[in-house]
Amino acid sequence: GGKSFVDSLDPDGVDVLVLAGDIGVVKGGSLHRGFDLLATKYRGIPIIFLMGNHELYGSSPDWAEEQVDALTKDHPNLHWLENNTVEIGGQRFVGSTLWFPNLPDGQNTRFSRGLNDFHLIYDFQQWVYDHNAASVEFLTREVQPGDVVVTHHIPTVQGVHPRWLHDVQGFGRFFLSQMPDDVLQRPKLWFYGHTHDSMDFEIGGCRFLCNPFGYVRREENPRFNPKLLMGV
């Protein structure tokens, strides 16, 4: 289970641990158990965390957010980012789950029938589009040169692995939210998750990194680097 993910990590030389979501499910306690393990392994080290879509499975967004807010009070080194900014050691971290928009082609409803998010998260459909719009507005306003940005969903089509590019107008529309070019080029580093393929590329002066473990029982990403360290 998730213990294999935690066991794979090496805290040596780490000043800040960044987790871009899908760490566990709030309902049922797997997220809480994961952070009990992480808080022990990274004792005294700040942990930047944001929720992915899996954290919300089996619950409503409002209820899950209340539980995560309480979780941060149990672990003082845990910093939950959701349309907010935290500064650690003089470095700004700006974060948002981000989600995905209701595309103007009117096809979201048709494709949504195949996405677990719409079936396993309560009170989701209108919430997700409103939340995405608020997140895009927040990041557009908040991100400054030199920032480190963390999102769960992919912020640009360039961050989609080539094997999924054929589907970005289909089911893949729920993987990303295309941010404006000027926002993408503003920070120096942008971490994201959601996809289970490692990615590393640049847009303007910003480096984009995705380093996912993937589903723990499938060992599906052989390129996952448990010792990935980025200097900022």
Explain the meaning of each model-derived region.
Residues 27-30, 63-67, 127-138, 171-178:
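Soluble or luminal CAZymes and related metallo-dependent hydrolases
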Residues 17-22, 48-53, 79-83, 148-151, ...:
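Active-site neighborhood of phospho(di)ester-bond hydrolases with catalytic His/Asp-centered motifs
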Residues 76, 86-87, 161, 170-189, ...:
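Binuclear metal-dependent phosphoesterase catalytic core
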